[in-house]
């Protein structure tokens, strides 16, 4: 009953032009249920309070029941009087092909493919502007992590990045990057520290802005490469299945209601190298390592919802940890 009432509340209050964008009060409500995977972390910068939101080990049902698709790295900056200065979006949660009901092949095969981009293998990055005009780079949940420090360093030393970021913040657009560096290796190697532009989002409506409409502003900033034109999902699946030395692709489609819908296609090469679908995921020491390294969400994302036994086993270990 509590969840049903919450869903009614969300449906009445969150939807903005097709995107469910939480206000601060609504984000707090998502965290208040005792079974909620969502949580808030608070910090302070130059006397301004900041709240980050995220989720711990959320399953598909949590995103559906709470409408929590926007809670990953959602950030609020407050004025000194306690009022909200601005809310900063990140990327909404999306899934792998065939991972959850909404990303099943039988559903998305009928969607129009708009763009296919290379999936970079680093850490998500964005920027926040404070009431005093200060701009800081951030990782998903921090201004102080090694990744956040690197993100801010690129902003301060790369004039093209700074120019683009400043323009987006002045126009209430969120520029979302992938931070890659030799010292930030996940699986793939990157030879230098840089920010690769992934997306531009309207910070008020959540709408994804076509990068190709703003190439003059993007300038020489590196963009996650656009793949060849793909109109046929079957062909794209065949191509990705044969690729090596890359993580995969992000597919941006248009659903039957005209709304942007994203899903991921990972290469078998990357999955095998990352050990995501090997027997290792059933070994307690391996699972504990993923939990401690904050990689378990990626692991869970590779296990289909139908693999109930695997999910249950991992969840039991998570609760112990």
What are these language model-derived features?
Residues 7-321:
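Core nucleotide-handling region used for phosphoryl-transfer chemistry
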Residues 1-4:
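A signal for long, low-complexity, Ser/Thr/Asn-enriched, surface-exposed stalk/shaft
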